[in-house]
Amino acid sequence: VGSINDAREEIINLCKIKKIHQIPIVDNKGNLIGIEVLNELISNKKKSNKVILMVGGLGTRLHPLTEKTPKPMLEVGKKPILLTIVEKFAEYGYSDIVMCVNHKADIIRDYFGDGAKFGVNIEYVLEDKRMGTAGALSLINEKITEPFFVMNGDLLTNVNFQHLHDFHTSNLSMATMCVRDYDFEIPYGVVNIKNTKILSIDEKPLHKFFVNAGIYIFDPEVLQFIPKDQFYDMPTLFNKLINENLKIISFPIREYWIDIGRTEELEKANNEFNKEF
């Protein structure tokens, strides 16, 4: 049995070790979400689901590095962050890519072109103003008929995109958000008080949360909830879907993931790249 958190290469190796041609994949609760076929994993058959990459950010926190270079084009592991993202999707057969560009769009277009030299097809949507993490989706003219991925262009991850897709579809979800564990320790003793009475004292309590990992998969029907030609971010979209009583779920990421928003994360990603990729 394979896990939803196993990478493609791990599943291939497991099939070879066990000398099997098919392997069931289960989620973290042991529920069956799909079956992987060894021949399909090795052949890397191309899939028709679109991948929409949000790459128009200003990268303000990474100045001066982003004064001449858009953040997704900063190098990690001696190649642009965005190239690694494209390669990871292509590894799972997702080669139909749309890049939503704004800040220094020409640099991204000049590097990737139509994507042919990278084995993918790339189209571009130009934001002529800031549209937010969801607003740019309203600019896509082509009719989308299948579940599609959306990902921020400043992330590096080893998430299994095929398992994310299967998890989304098997749960009949309208929208699925990838989430990460985040722990926060308060460095003091926290005093719980009612009026002036001390009820309890917790010494340096550890709070655990799930945070948005910046990777999503949506059913096409979600697009009707995004207003045209205006700023609209992902939290607003998800809250709208919640208010509409639509099924939206989370997909916990256990694999490697890093958000490269500051110089500290950029340095960390460079130090870890060869080990993780």
Regions found by a protein language model. Name each.
Residues 1-20, 26-27:
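The conserved cystathionine-beta-synthase
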Residues 79-152, 158, 163, 228:
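Conserved N-terminal catalytic core of the sugar/cofactor nucleotidyltransferase
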Residues 171-181:
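A short, conserved acidic/glycine-rich loop-to-beta-strand motif
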Residues 58, 154-155:
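Active-site metal-binding loops of divalent metal-dependent hydrolases
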Residues 20-24, 31-45:
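Short beta->alpha transition motifs characteristic of CBS
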Residues 44-108:
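N-terminal glycine-rich phosphate-binding loop and ensuing alpha1 helix
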Residues 36, 103, 151, 193, ...:
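A conserved hydrophobic position in a structured secondary element of the catalytic/binding core
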